[in-house]
UniProtKB/Swiss-Prot annotation:
Taxonomic lineage of the native organism: Bacteria, Pseudomonadati, Thermodesulfobacteriota, Desulfuromonadia, Desulfuromonadales
Disulfide bonds, paired cysteine numbers: none
Any single biological process term in GO: fatty acid biosynthetic process
The species this protein was found in: Syntrophotalea carbinolica (strain DSM 2380 / NBRC 103641 / GraBd1) (Pelobacter carbinolicus)
Principal subcellular localisation of the protein: cytoplasm
Residues binding Zn(2+): C29, C32, C48, C51
Known catalytic reactions: N(6)-carboxybiotinyl-L-lysyl-[protein] + acetyl-CoA = N(6)-biotinyl-L-lysyl-[protein] + malonyl-CoA
NCBIfam families, sorted: accD (TIGR00515)
Keyword Metal-binding in annotation: yes
Keywords: ATP-binding, Cytoplasm, Fatty acid biosynthesis, Fatty acid metabolism, Lipid biosynthesis, Lipid metabolism, Metal-binding, Nucleotide-binding, Transferase, Zinc, Zinc-finger
Pathway: Lipid metabolism; malonyl-CoA biosynthesis; malonyl-CoA from acetyl-CoA: step 1/1
Role summary: Component of the acetyl coenzyme A carboxylase (ACC) complex. Biotin carboxylase (BC) catalyzes the carboxylation of biotin on its carrier protein (BCCP) and then the CO(2) group is transferred by the transcarboxylase to acetyl-CoA to form malonyl-CoA.
Protein name, per record: Acetyl-coenzyme A carboxylase carboxyl transferase subunit beta
EC number: 2.1.3.15
Zn finger limits (C4-type): 29-51
Amino acid sequence: MAWFKKSKAPIVPVESKKVKMPEGVWRKCPHCNEIIYAKEIERNLNVCPKCDYHFRISARERIALVLDEGSFVERDAGMKSVDFLEFKDGKRYRDRISAAIKKSGLNDAVIWGEGAIEAQPVVVAVFDFSFMGGSMGSVVGEKITRAVEKALENRCPCLVFSSSGGARMQESIMSLMQMAKTSAALSRLKEAGLPYISIMTDPTTGGVTASFAMLGDVNMAEPRALIGFAGPRVIEQTIRQKLPEGFQRSEYLLEHGMIDMIVRRPEMKARLSQMLRIFMKQ
């Protein structure tokens, strides 16, 4: 007689009950890798409560955070890019524009208009990275230029929040021309004695950094923002050297005198208000 008798009936594994979790309930911080309740991040102005990492936000979210409630009047909302070169890489440029409009709900990578910060009138232009990486084409350059010209007309400060991968390659020389165009407009603002405050957020790179983003009377940045011309990976491959820790981050730039200050998102409005009072002698 066998000591152990095999059961004839097969062993059926107990099915585990899978709980379906709705998408977007939790978010992973790319800096500290913590899994955090999404609403907790939103309550903290899209800043990680564990490590202070500043998540990217949309242009409209930033406007709501910085400007007085109900004060913003948008200009040139219907302005759209045109595929004048009939550019095509893996995809036609006109199709990329249509896809970006559908994804972001915007007609291009910048929103600009008039508003107020603690009752101080300002003209503000804000990049939205979700529209083709915040790249600068003819529409972006025109909007920035119009914002500067409106500040001249209103005799008030101009603020630009940058978040861009640089010039838009699909527009070739027309996108590069915007660097000179925006810089020339800011030169006229400077001659008029009106303040221009540049706020660089993650990331601010390429032709945007090489033009108006670095021309502020005060150059501010959010914590850990990537700021530079070429990206760190491209630089390492070119010079074949390992870059220093934190290279091109806002803290590194502040340490080396490239920017004036780093301001956390919850403190941004108060700091801007302070700067505006100093500049406008109020």
